[in-house]
Amino acid sequence: MTEAMIRKKPGMASVKDMPLLQDGPPPGGFAPVRYARRISNTGPSAMAIFLTVSGAFAWGMYQVGQGNKIRRALKEEKYAARRAILPILQAEEDERFVSEWKKYLEYEADVMKDVPGWKVGENVYNSGRWMPPATGELRPDVW
């Protein structure tokens, strides 16, 4: 199909038949283009920025110091509470150990009753130095 049939107008025979429309500059020409670097002369000065940042940093460090004081006080309170109850816990552990040690000595006496010359509770290593007893055997609830 030709343009004449679609648009109901006669088509162009040549490009030369086209109307001459061309874009151009406006009358008087275009405004000059500014291509130089644009440095703003508004806004805070370098000194104002420096002082603001320094103040914010100083305030932040002050807050860190206050947090350290609070954390140190809480830690000291926790340690003081532990130091306060430590003698009670140690007394309970000593009492438990003595009762378990008595049971252990009774068991040892029962097991070794047929061995001549066996002394119940005597150290078998005879190193001459005092060593704390191996409490692993006396703590079946832990192991």
Curated annotation (Swiss-Prot):
Q: Signal peptide position in this chain? A: none
Tell where it localizes.
Answer: Mitochondrion inner membrane
> Which residue ranges does UniProt annotate as crossing the membrane?
43-65
- How is this protein positioned relative to the membrane? Single-pass membrane protein
* Highest taxon of the lineage: Eukaryota
Q: Which UniProt keywords apply?
A: Electron transport, Membrane, Mitochondrion, Mitochondrion inner membrane, Respiratory chain, Transmembrane, Transmembrane helix, Transport
Q: Name one Pfam family in it.
A: GRIM-19
An example Gene Ontology CC term for this record? mitochondrion
**This protein's record includes keyword Protease:** no
Q: Principal localization?
A: mitochondrion
The GO annotation for biological process reads:
photorespiration
Report if keyword Mitochondrion is assigned. yes
UniProt-listed InterPro entries: GRIM-19
The subunit structure is: Complex I is composed of at least 49 different subunits.
Q: What does this protein do?
A: Accessory subunit of the mitochondrial membrane respiratory chain NADH dehydrogenase (Complex I), that is believed not to be involved in catalysis. Complex I functions in the transfer of electrons from NADH to the respiratory chain. The immediate electron acceptor for the enzyme is believed to be ubiquinone.
Q: Which family does it belong to?
A: Belongs to the complex I NDUFA13 subunit family.
User: What is the protein name given in its UniProt record?
Assistant: NADH dehydrogenase [ubiquinone] 1 alpha subcomplex subunit 13-B
Organism whose genome encodes this protein = Arabidopsis thaliana (Mouse-ear cress)
UniProt lineage: Eukaryota, Viridiplantae, Streptophyta, Embryophyta, Tracheophyta
